[in-house]
Amino acid sequence: DLLGLHRSVSVEARRLIQEATGIPPQNVLISATHTHSAGTALGKNRYVNEQELDNYQRFVARRIADGVRCAVNALRPAEIAYGTIDVPEHVFNRRWRMREGSVKPNPFGKTDGVQTNPPVASPDLVEPAGPTDPAVSILAVREPGGRLICVYCAYGLHYIGGTGPAHISADYYGMFCEALKRLQPAAHQPGGDAAPPFVAMLANGTSGDINNIDRLHPRPGRKPYEQMRDVAEDMAQKVNAAL
């Protein structure tokens, strides 16, 4: 759970994974979340393709590789399934076409026809500048004919925010994982080598233009964590129903 992950961290993690397990880099997919209430592994200059890693980036790469090594050590026969469900009620395009003359000139002296994060319920709103993607992609793995081992999901929604002051938080991604685990009997079985714990994961899908704010309908103020918890619980219920 990070603000962002630089390509160089991913490259180093793949190298360490191959070194520890023999899995070639081209067989490794690394995904992340995007939260403004966590640290960053983007480094000093996120805009370069290659960079020397700082101490935190090296730590992140090592922990990614450690996670893969632990998974390899717990390998067992499994069945895999995949699918999608639509959860459209939480995703809104934050790029809006605005009434002509309502947008201030940009730094280059020209006027954009589209504004990012315009004021909620502004009379200058015309229409969203693009679509949303309501799909929650689901990848589920279980023991043959038995208990779930893990569920990996992706959803095209920015972080939600609304934490306490200076709090570190995995945002709705972390809350979704905890909610889904509570709904799974496999998560409550005894641990040990015979039954590794159920793992739930949620990745950030393509969501550069998408957030959780309905620009047309103002939402009453909410307590810290309340909105992200509502979204996470709702998503977990719907994913669980689809499993």
Report residues per predicted region.
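Long, well-ordered mid-to-C-terminal structural blocks that present hydrophobic/aromatic surfaces
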Residues: 231-241
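Conserved beta-alpha junction segments in alpha/beta enzyme cores
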Residues: 1-199, 203-209, 213-230, 243
